[in-house]
């Protein structure tokens, strides 16, 4: 599709079509942040409505009519001028942020010991968020390959989102030593519900789902790279330090120290290795303006086919923004770097 492909977005607030849409900006990223949507209307009637907290849906309709919304969420902020009204919204996971007073308290007498993170999330949403109606769908929520447990977690007045993300960070599938894979929290907008789910990053060795080139899909491409952490440092509870060095460090050593103490030297070393390898996958950043795949999911593996050897290859999609303004549509994708190599390991 070209950049000039027809786009006919439709916005619903509480199931009612809202006219006079002037612009919007949609953003999503693979870093456990919420999807956001900012819209501007020139509809004078909206000023008389109490829109805060109301349900909003955006159908992008780029080139064809969409069967599911690009975004579904709830309005978190409204501002108005003499001629325009701006609304900000976040996806339904905002009800796990603690802003509405729903927090998690775990004590020795009341806790989630023995539950996996997935089981806890299902139980918590069912009883605390979806008590009166389905705010966050659960039909897409399944157990992860490497379950993490809530055993021993004790928190007071903790925001559910913080507890979920910090616990999920412990889940790493390191069955492929050369490319450990972590998980992120995503939202799947279906016809009537928006379902929360855990996604594992795809192996970069997998077949690319889409190919982008300057002849097919790439409107503009920007590239930058930062030095990766090549040294991981972790400590045991008794103070023993474990270090892992990746590669021959020709440009010098850049260390990252893990928070927390580990039970054994083996656990500390394993954590240091995983941290370095996970961070290595996020040092090369590609920003592409694209004319296709506006509905692409986070974590999707794509192949960027460009003349530059340093850029050409497979990447994961780590972020997406879509902007609409006066019928002009711009879609931008963020992608991360190529896979690492087992031959680069040095065990010190």
Give the location of each predicted region.
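Short low-polarity hydrophobic stretches
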Residues: 1, 11, 39-41, 75, ...
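Assembly/oligomerization scaffold segments
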Residues: 1-105, 169-170, 202-221
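Acidic, small/polar-enriched beta strand-loop surface segments
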Residues: 1-5, 110, 179-327, 337-344
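A generic structural motif
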Residues: 37-40, 84-90, 194-197, 287-289, ...
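Surface-exposed loop/turn positions
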Residues: 54-56, 115, 300
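Short edge beta-strand segments in beta-sheet-rich domains
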Residues: 70, 84, 156, 229, ...
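Charged- and aromatic-enriched interaction segments used to assemble
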Residues: 83-223
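C-terminal output/interaction extensions
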Residues: 101, 342-348
């Amino acid at each position: 599709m070209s950049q000039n492909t027809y786009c006919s977005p439709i916005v619903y607030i509480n199931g009612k079509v809202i006219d006079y849409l002037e612009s919007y900006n949609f953003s999503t990223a693979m870093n456990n942040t919420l999807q956001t949507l900012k819209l501007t209307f020139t509809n004078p009637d909206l000023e008389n409505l109490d829109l805060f907290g109301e349900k909003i849906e955006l159908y992008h309709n780029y080139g064809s009519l969409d069967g599911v919304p690009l975004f579904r969420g709830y309005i978190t902020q409204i501002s108005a001028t003499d001629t325009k009204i701006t609304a900000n919204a976040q996806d339904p996971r905002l009800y796990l942020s603690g802003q509405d007073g729903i927090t998690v308290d775990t004590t020795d007498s009341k806790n989630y010991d023995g539950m996996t993170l997935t089981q806890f999330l299902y139980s918590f949403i069912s009883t605390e968020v979806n008590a009166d109606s389905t705010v966050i769908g659960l039909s897409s929520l399944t157990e992860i390959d490497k379950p993490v447990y809530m055993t021993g977690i004790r928190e007071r007045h903790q925001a559910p989102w913080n507890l979920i993300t910090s616990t999920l960070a412990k889940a790493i599938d390191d069955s492929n030593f050369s490319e450990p894979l972590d998980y992120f929290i995503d939202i799947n907008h279906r016809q009537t519900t928006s379902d929360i789910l855990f996604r594992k990053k795809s192996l970069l060795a997998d077949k690319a789902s889409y190919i982008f080139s300057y002849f097919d899909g790439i409107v503009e491409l920007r590239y930058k790279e930062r030095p990766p952490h090549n040294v991981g440092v972790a400590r045991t509870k008794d103070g023993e330090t474990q270090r892992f060095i990746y590669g021959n460090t020709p440009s010098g050593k850049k260390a990252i120290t893990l928070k927390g103490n580990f039970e054994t030297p083996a656990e500390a070393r394993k954590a240091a290795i995983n941290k370095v390898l996970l961070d290595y996958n996020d040092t090369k950043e590609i920003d592409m303006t694209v004319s296709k795949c506006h509905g692409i999911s986070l974590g999707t593996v794509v192949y960027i086919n460009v003349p530059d050897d340093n850029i050409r290859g497979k990447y994961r999609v780590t972020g997406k923004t879509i902007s609409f303004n006066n019928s002009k549509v711009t879609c931008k994708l963020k992608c991360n770097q190529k896979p690492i190599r087992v031959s680069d390991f040095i065990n010190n």
